[in-house]
């Protein structure tokens, strides 16, 4: 860009942790020149009396607009309900700036899951088993913009 005008930088928030479906991350932008969408939170998997296995995962963010080089975010691993008393929370996608949060297995007592280890990474999934109190998923990492100025 030659002779750019002043631009407003907006850093998107990471997805919010919940015991149900995860919250979506919000958009990071550099004025109208660059838009980076936030990732989507995973839907909560539902137990099924007829299925031995049930699961769901969050989709990675869509690709950036206005970037010379860019790519869409990756998907995390699926959270799985294995039986009425056993489940495994999904692990989040990594970014170039940090590791995604881990999703532990679930057998009582449950522990809360990992938050993102860096900007742009996802938070680990939440999990619940039977009548045990659900473990909350981890928070996603906030967005990031790096500006290099050359003269």
For the regions a language model picked out, list residue spans one by one:
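Extended hydrophobic/aromatic segments used for targeting, binding, or gating
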Residues: 124-127, 151
């Amino acid at each position: 860009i030659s002779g750019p005008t002043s631009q407003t930088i907006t850093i998107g928030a990471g997805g919010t942790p919940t015991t149900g479906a995860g919250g979506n991350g919000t958009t990071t932008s550099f004025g109208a020149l660059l838009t980076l969408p936030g990732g989507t939170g995973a839907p909560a998997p539902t137990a099924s009396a007829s299925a031995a296995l049930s699961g769901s995962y969050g989709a990675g963010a869509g690709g950036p607009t206005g970037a010379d080089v860019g790519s869409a975010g990756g998907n995390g691993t699926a959270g799985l309900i294995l039986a009425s008393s056993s489940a495994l929370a999904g692990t989040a996608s990594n970014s170039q700036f940090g590791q995604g949060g881990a999703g532990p297995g679930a057998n009582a007592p449950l522990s809360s899951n990992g938050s993102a280890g860096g900007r742009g990474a996802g938070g680990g999934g939440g999990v619940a088993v039977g009548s045990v109190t659900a473990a909350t998923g981890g928070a996603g990492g906030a967005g990031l913009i790096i500006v290099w100025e050359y003269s």
